Amino acid sequence: MDVNWMDDDEDLVAALAMHEEQKSEDADGTRWEHCDEACDGFDMATGHNWIYPNNLPLRSYQQTIVQSALFKNTLVVLPTGLGKTFIAAVVMYNFYRWYPKGKIVFMAPTRPLVSQQIHASQKIMPFPSEDTVQLTGQLPRPKRAELWASKRVFFATPQVVHSDMLEADGECSFPFGSIKLIVVDEAHRAKGRYAYTQVADCLMARNRYFRMLALSATPGRTMEDVAAVCRNLYISNLQVRWDTSIDVQPYIHRRTIRTIVVSLKERIKEPRERLLQIIEPYLRQLMEAEIFKGNKGTVSRNSLLFEQKSFVERSAQGQRHPDHNIIMGNFAMCISMYHSLDLMERHGLRVFVNNFDADDDGREKFVLARDGNLRNLVEQVRQELGANPLDYTTHAMTNGEVPPLPSDLDFGHAKYEKLRQVLVQHFQANPDSRAIVFCEYRESVMLIHRLLLQHRPVLRPRCFVGQGSTVGASYALTQKQQLQIMTDFRSGTSNVLVATSIGEEGLDVGEVEMIVCFDICSTNPTRFIQRIGRTGRKKNGEVVMLVTEGREQQVLKDVLANKDQINKKLLNSSVVKLSLYEQNPRMVPSKFQPKCEEKHMEPVAEEKPKPKSAAKTKESRKRKQPVAQTGSLRKYFKESPPTESQQGILQGIKPYQMSEASQQLVKQQVLRRSVTLKNFFGESQASSTLTSSQEDVQRLRKLTRLLQSSKPFVSDSKDLMSHLQDDHLPRQIKLYLLKSNPEFLRETHLKMQVQSELNIADDRLNSRQRRTKNNYQLLLDICDGMDQMNELLQGDNSGAEISFRDELNPIYNQSPKKFDTICEQIFDGLNEHGLNSNNFELKQDLLEKLELRNLETTVNEQLGGIEASWSEEEWDQQEEDVKFESMYLSQQLNLPDANVVPHSSTPLRVKPLSKLMFKTLQGDIEEEYHSGMEASELGDNLGRLNSLMNASESKIKATERIAPIPVVDSTIETNHFPAVEESQRSTPISIADSSGESNHCAVNKNSEIYPMSIDETKVEVKSSLNLKMHAESIVEDLDIDLDDFLEPMDKELELASQTKGKSQENIVDHQMEKLEKNCEQKETAHNNDLDLTDEDLKEFLEPMVEEVELMSQKKANDFKDFLEPMPEELELMSQQKKNILLPSTETIKNSENKNSHEDGSRTVSPDIFGSDSMSPLKPQGKSLAAKLAAKAAAKVLPCPPPNSVGLNSPENRKRTNPSIQEKSPSIFDLYLNRMRGRGRLAKAAENLHRITSTNPTISVPKDEEDSPIARRPSKRKIVISSDEEEEQKPQIAETQVDCESDDYERILDTQMPDPRKTPTRPRHKRSKFNSFILDEAEKSGSDHEEEGETTIGTYLKDSMIVSSDDEDHNDTNTHAIYLRALKSPIQRPGAFKMPPPRVFRDESHIFSQPVEDDSSQYMQCSFIVDDESSTIERGHDVSECPLEKAERILKERRKQRRLGKVPSAPVNKRRRLQTISTSSDEDDVVLID
């Protein structure tokens, strides 16, 4: 059976072979039919041969590959340096001949590579320059469209070609039909959606008949990659060679590969281990979720990226993990930190640290924000490394040299030192050689560049990176800079090139003897082969591999093992063969069989690029313009022979010759003036639009400047060079010009010295350097050698000495009368200055003088015409006296200079504004200060003006205003504000003194307060007023007035020192009232003062920011004092037990009697969570209800203590801060007070009122105000649900009645529960006093310092006791823990008592005896939920099963029906949500009943 199958298989194979042969013949027939269409535009005259150049050495493999590429779409795979560009140039030239109207495109991935290929191709084959062009993205689209239409050979990047193809879809400007050949360099990039693939697809869609030639040294990592390249580029033929091929081996230069393994030092191992420990938790979570498998030591960044991609794909398909977001976050953390680990191992600690630097916007890496241990590790390593080498610049200075770098820089890895040793040894042995260092990242390139700069001039490194955007310390290069760097490297200006991957592919850098691979990026052999291919191109080379021990070393081994395997397997790979393009056009008519014709090809002579030539013509024109303007004018006139008479005259007249004495006299005059009149008159040519007077003024000014200056003979170097280059100018005058311009000679000499030190070849000089060289050669010709030039450089400039003497003794000082006479002659007949004359400086001087004069006049008028001033020594003496008169002032003056008031500003200043123009200081002091800083300064005149004003303050009149008296709370320390510098910007407290003898208690309402100390004000006022002897009486009166005015402020200091030790004397409101009374008394006592309104007093008493802060501090102390236990509280509690049913008026009386000595001015609601409110070390004080009653009574009948004194203190002043301003009750508040106990608001309205209320406190419900039971603050949410609402008869205590009035005190929101009340019902019977509640309160009342008080009504309604298992009372807010609980014998729901704890009797094993109804049933932390069934359940076993309980309830209800008692309808089930603040960490407790 098997044999029969084998025979059948052989027959099948034979049949298939015959079918394929027939199919191929049919395909050939179709090709010949379509040959005419494919060869459209073919030149029949050139079809019999194809040209191969013989001016270069013949290589058989190149000729074979060219012949194959002419007729098939070919992929050429050759090792680097074996002439792939030569093959491409020969194929391009033959298609250029065959298709005279066809177009050829050569594409390379980078711009430097494109520029290199166009020059190499033109050297190999003679492509005419008029038909060849290089296209870049810098050219505009319209310009490129014109080039596509007019040129034939294009060198461009694939991105530009694809862009023009897409642009041509609507306009059809791209010549799709004319494209006959496309050459693709570095073809291994043609994968995915790269531009190579897109260009081929676009062209194939429009034109199927074109030739494709692809070039690469490494077509792919795997066979699948090579097959993808073949499919994307429509390849039908492969031409593959490797290093050991027979026809290639003679042309291969030997490359020595040397591997240097660098071991990790301890300084890297320790941070590496710490980083692995930081990664471990995130990696373990991925493994526990079964997302990733592996060990933390073997995991790599690439494997994590692959697993993350797979996880995202599974999630997109509907297999979303429950912890998707957590897993994605762990992936991100692991990927980022493993990347940092690779940087640390391969590039060192410096690159590792810099990887975590913030971006350009200042945002730090998310891994640092998420993990604090990683942040600490990075900061520690950064501190250990020291200075960052990237902080030092490598740009050349003005002299052309790079500044030296420190030699002790730490680069963070041993690789850098090995690299230094390898390169220094190589270049010491081979000074004329060149080397390339390849790195993965730009940051490593920058570090290596700075490392090698330390060894100049042996090493002359240059960086070569891409054109990408700048990232951190790395930078990007432009195309022009890239080309210049490559040119310098090829010419030998720089001998070390430090490059990234941009230097790996295709660049022909000439003869490079050494390649250093600083790192191994991946196991892909493509990049490795590309790197080592930069050497050994023309002679033997050396490759040095620097690898770190461990994973990088293993990667290198894998690369070396696989680098030659791919190319050898290409030809036998079935995957690659199946991917070849079968419909390959021949592109040559079938009747032609072109033969190879070897021909000597002369390359086209190099022509300078048009842009450069255009730029040079512009420069040359600019350079020749001044020469044309200052040259000889003879060419502008026609030369005609002289007449006979003219000849006779010329022959009879001898030429004039100046005598030696005249020449000496002229030289002396010229040297003495050191200025040329020619230049003066040339520069002083006035415009035609100027009037004659303006022209004369300008000429006079220029003449004066020229007479007083020591300018060189010819100031402009361009003018000087034009004179020196003039052939008609005698040599002696040129020497004189050089003597008069030594700076120009010295500058040119220095530039030439620097240029000669650089050893730059003549053909590499730029325009500026060539200009310097030409100028220097001209100077040498004029000086007849270096000897005379050195004399000019060393000689003294006599003209400068004469000019200096003229400066010291000008002409108008030598003879004033003569100078005045000359000036009168010059100005005789001139008109006045025009409006547009250039006299800005003169105007400024006049304006300053006029402004100063007006200010002094104004001050003198206001001060009664008194002018006085004193020296700065006197002012310094006054300042020294001031410093020691006040301790507070001395502290203030010892602050930094930035806050010290300058001596020109005084506390009292004259205010030159009108009486009605006052600016408020509140809200505008910042703006006024900054505006004062921006004011125009008048220099020393302001100091003089301030001194004059300060000296004249003794003559203050009644209608004038005095500068501000700074007032600040004396208890606030080191509180300073910047003083206003300008006298015009003072916005002080205006003190009006009509008689000069009276006191002031009130001030203007528009006045403002400077935040300075009282003593400082007094001292400065005194020191300012004691400056003049003739004003002593006025000074004494003013001092007396100020002492009277400021006397309460001194008491305020004493009060502030006493307030700290006293806890129950905070009488803010009463002091405010007392202060107003005192002010009124003072106001009536001083009738001779200015009449100031009450509004002025209120405005003056407004507290400042510091006062408000002081009040807030005192409030905190008041809260503690307010909540201190009082000795009367026990007495009050006993009275409440006896008199609980008495009328409410008795409570008011009792509270008045008990609190008569208590301060009644407290307006701030107490903080029951204060630190000292319920300390267990203090005796038990009054309850909150008692204190509230006492406060309410004090408000109704205020009785200030007799010993209270009203002072002008910020503590006693009326509060005007809008954030804590007292307001009249709103309608909503009145409604709440009126409806208390009669219902409740809707939830939405209640929340709205709570949110929009300006007062942060809300009222407490009536049934929650008097509870001595401390409520446990908790963050837990307790849901209480009951099927039936209890009918509860409210019990009104004595202390609750006073809260019915509108003067109730608002309590903090945190003290209140949700104010939900059941509708009140009429009481039929007065309830009996429940002693169990008060007993329980006395026994279990909280004494903890952080616990608050709430009301009894809360727990009567909720019947809930929340306890805690914690025994550490310092960490919890609840001190009372209910250990046992019993039902109260009183017939009332919710009544309970707390008996002493009993010994637990374990009788659970006895089933025949009933369980006693004792406290053992209620364990710790139990909840007692109160409802109507509690009365029914009384006396029954709590442990009965639900069925028995239900049967019992049914029996009771049937019994009630028989007796005629109809049970009330059940109330709808309600869910009540309460949030109780707590400091414990317990979970949310939800209780549903």
Swiss-Prot record:
Changing residue 84 to M: Loss of ATPase and helicase activity. Residues 611-625 have a biased composition (Basic residues). Residues 65-237 form the Helicase ATP-binding domain. ATP binds at residues 78-85. It comes from the Eukaryota. It is found in: Nucleus. Residues 1480-1489 have a biased composition (Acidic residues). Its EC number is 5.6.2.4. GO terms for molecular function: 3'-5' DNA helicase activity; ATP binding; four-way junction DNA binding; four-way junction helicase activity; hydrolase activity. Keywords: ATP-binding, DNA damage, DNA repair, Helicase, Hydrolase, Isomerase, Nucleotide-binding, Nucleus. Pfam families: DEAD, Helicase_C. Disruption phenotype: Increased incidence of spontaneous mitotic crossovers. Increased sensitivity to DNA damage caused by the cross linking agent nitrogen mustard mechlorethamine (HN2), the alkylating agent methyl methanesulfonate (MMS), and double-strand break inducing ionizing radiation (IR). Residues 591-647, 980-1000, 1145-1182, 1196-1222, 1255-1293, 1452-1489 are annotated as: Disordered. It is an enzyme of class 5 (isomerase). Residues 985-998 have a biased composition (Polar residues). Residues 594-610, 1149-1161 have a biased composition (Basic and acidic residues). Belongs to the DEAD box helicase family. DEAH subfamily. FANCM sub-subfamily. A ssDNA-dependent ATPase with 3' to 5' helicase activity. Involved in multiple DNA-damage responses, some that require ATPase and helicase activity and some that are independent of these. Involved in DNA interstrand cross-link repair, probably together with Fancl and other Fanconi anemia pathway homologs. Independent of Fancl involved in DNA double strand break repair, including contributing to the synthesis-dependent strand annealing (SDSA) pathway. Probably contributes to SDSA by unwinding short duplex regions in complex D-loop-like DNA structures. This is DEAD-box ATP-dependent DNA helicase Fancm. It comes from Drosophila melanogaster. The gene is Fancm.
